[in-house]
A protein has these predicted regions:
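Acidic, glycine/proline-rich low-complexity segments that act as flexible tails and inter-domain linkers
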Residues: 1-13, 61-80
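Short, thiol/selenol-centered motifs that function as redox-active sites or metal-ligating centers
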Residues: 15, 19-31, 56
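Iron-sulfur (Fe-S) cluster-binding segments and ferredoxin-like electron-carrier domains
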Residues: 31-46, 69-72
Length: 80
């Protein structure tokens, strides 16, 4: 379901990340940050997804942006 189709895998991972943030799923956020980066998503694109998730999910979603940052940091450390 997350591979290339009418929407490419990169776009689907961005959608999945936004949904993970609004669902407040720490595990899902970590997985989809990693999969997004592996699919070629930029940090700027992840930041934009975070902004959309905050608009859609409000304050509760905002608190989970820290989990996105943690996942980005872990990915960078593992691939430095």
């Amino acid at each position: 379901a997350l591979g290339d189709g009418v929407l490419d895998a990169k776009t689907k991972e961005l959608i999945a990340l936004g949904m993970a943030i609004t669902a407040r799923c720490v595990y899902c956020i970590g997985i989809h940050v990693e999969k997004s980066l592996r699919a070629g998503v930029s940090h700027a694109e992840i930041v934009e997804v975070c902004k959309v998730a905050i608009v859609m999910g409000g304050g509760p979603a905002m608190t989970y942006i820290a989990e996105v940052k943690k996942a980005l940091d872990l990915f960078e450390q593992a691939h430095a």
